[in-house]
Regions:
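N-terminal "assembly arms/tails" that initiate or stabilize quaternary assembly
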Residues: 1-66
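Conserved active-site and cofactor/substrate-binding residues in soluble primary-metabolism enzymes
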Residues: 16, 20, 75-80, 94-98, ...
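Short, compositionally biased low-complexity segments
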Residues: 1-4, 71-79, 122-129
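Alpha-helical scaffold segments that mediate packing/assembly in large oligomeric complexes
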Residues: 87, 91-98, 102-154
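Charged, low-complexity surface segments at secondary-structure and domain boundaries
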Residues: 2-15, 83-88, 131-141
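Long, hydrophobic/aromatic-enriched structural stretches that serve as scaffold segments
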Residues: 52-96
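Serine/threonine-rich low-complexity intrinsically disordered regions
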Residues: 11-14, 22, 43, 53-55, ...
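Generic N-terminal helix/loop capping motif
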Residues: 28-35, 81, 106, 110-113
Length: 154
C-alpha cells in the first residue's frame, strides 16, 4: 500500500518508528496466521480494492452480466499514546507496542475466521457446500496426526 494512502507523510511519526511498527506487525501476523500457511493468499492490496472481477455470466441470448467477488476489509483500531511516541523518538528503546500486537493478533484471527468459517457473502473452508469431513483419532501418540492427515487426503 502506498505511503500516500497510509498518510505517513502527514504523520508526526518518524521513519524509524514506522519501521519498528511495520516489523512488529509483520512478525506477529506471520506467527499467528494459519490460513496463509494452507492456502496461497494474496494481499493486503490497499484500501482501494473492494472487489475482484470474475468472468461475465450469460443470462440470456446476447445478454451477460458482469460478476464480481466482494472483498472483506479486515481491520482493528489501536492507540499508541503521544507521550509514548515522543519518548520513543527521544530514546528508541522505550515504546510499549502491546496495543499494536493486540490489534495485529485480532486482525489475524479475523482473517483466519473468514478463511475457515467464512462470512455472510462467502463460505469458508469448513462451511463451503460439499466440504469433505474425516474423523480424527487421538493425537497424543507420535505419528497419529500425520496418519490421520494422510488418510484424509488419499
Amino acid at each position: 500500500m502506498s505511503d500516500a494512502l497510509l498518510g505517513r507523510d502527514d504523520s508526526p511519526i518518524g521513519e524509524e518508528l514506522w519501521q519498528v511498527l511495520d516489523h512488529t506487525m509483520l512478525d506477529v501476523a506471520r506467527g499467528e496466521l494459519v490460513g496463509r500457511r494452507l492456502l496461497e493468499l494474496d494481499g493486503p492490496f490497499g484500501l482501494g480494492l473492494k472487489q475482484v472481477s470474475l468472468a461475465d455470466e450469460e443470462v440470456g441470448d446476447g445478454v451477460s452480466i458482469a460478476a464480481s467477488l466482494p472483498l472483506a476489509y479486515v481491520y482493528q483500531t489501536f492507540v499508541l499514546p503521544g507521550r509514548d511516541i515522543a519518548a520513543f523518538e527521544r530514546e528508541p528503546s522505550s515504546l510499549d507496542l502491546s496495543p499494536l500486537v493486540t490489534a495485529t493478533l485480532a486482525v489475524a484471527r479475523k482473517e483466519d475466521d473468514l478463511v475457515f468459517r467464512g462470512g455472510e457473502h462467502a463460505p469458508g473452508l469448513l462451511t463451503a457446500t460439499g466440504v469433505l469431513r474425516a474423523r480424527l483419532s487421538d493425537w497424543t501418540s507420535v505419528g497419529v496426526a500425520q496418519g490421520d492427515l494422510i488418510a484424509a487426503v488419499t
